[in-house]
A protein has these predicted regions:
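Active-site loop of short-chain dehydrogenase/reductase
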Residues: 6, 80-83, 97, 130-144, ...
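Conserved glycine-rich Rossmann-like NAD(P)H-binding loop of the short-chain dehydrogenase/reductase
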Residues: 28-43
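Rossmann-fold cofactor-recognition segment
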Residues: 48-62
Length: 242
């Protein structure tokens, strides 16, 4: 994948996996806009990374769309064309006691609005132009706890598990709708593993940099539609059942 005059948007980019993803894309020569919820943190992270930023709560779909439009207009004014890379690395964990029969409406809606609904908002706003231009990569951070072939069936953390299972289904469905890579548009989900982030905790076995590596690879890899695959769930550059 040539990175000449390419640009990306990374949600959740002010810390953790999103920050490391943005860092890797910048190292690959891609101009990046990060999105974070906290204004000061996003500003500080953007300064360290040497990129642009916007602050917004992605759970507010109206404001989130407005920010995505604003970023696109700003990028266009700087000479960029259609968005090349969209990485959706934002996310929240549901309350540890949120089993299906114990959780409440507020916790359910909070988790799904961020983990799943905001994925739809971003893709629905940005990906039509990418698909029409027959280009672009969308990478969505999912989780192994959302795998219905494995950990996702073990119960507990219901809003989180189900939101991530929804992400996996969303990616697969979108890939079929857009030609499974044959038209130049790629969409994939990743399981980063248990990483040392604010969500994962300091005792997690993997660093955020390790967790972000597959996302960076998917966003920048060369793709041959005759042999390579998209619309899948990946872990450490390997396809896993979803």
């Amino acid at each position: 994948m040539s990175d000449s005059k390419k640009w990306a948007i990374v949600t959740g980019g002010s810390r953790g996996l999103g920050y490391e993803t943005a860092k890797g894309l910048i190292a690959a020569g891609i101009s990046v806009y990060i999105i974070g919820k906290d204004e000061e943190r996003a500003k500080d992270s953007a300064k360290t990374l040497g990129c642009s930023y916007r602050a917004v709560d992605v759970a507010d779909s109206k404001k989130f769309r407005e920010v995505l439009i604003e970023i696109t207009q700003d990028a266009t004014s700087k000479g960029f064309e259609v968005l090349d890379v969209l990485v959706l690395a934002h996310g929240v964990m549901s309350d540890k006691m949120s089993k299906t029969l114990r959780t409440n409406d507020e916790e359910w809606r909070r988790t799904l609005s961020i983990n799943l609904d905001a994925v739809f908002t971003a893709v629905n706003q940005l990906a039509p132009a990418m698909a029409e231009a027959r280009k672009g990569r969308v990478v969505v951070y999912s989780a192994c706890l959302g795998r219905m072939s494995g950990p996702g069936t073990h119960g507990g953390l219901a809003p989180y598990r189900i939101s991530k299972a929804g992400v996996n289904a969303f990616v697969k469905n979108l890939s079929y709708e857009t030609g499974l890579g044959a038209r130049g548009f790629l969409v994939d989900a990743i399981c980063p593993g248990h990483c040392r982030t604010d969500m994962g905790g300091e005792d997690a076995p993997r660093s955020a940099q390790e967790g972000a590596e597959t996302a960076i690879w998917l966003a920048t890899r060369d793709f041959d539609a005759t042999k390579d695959k998209t619309g899948l769930l990946w872990e450490d550059r390997t396809v896993v059942d979803w």
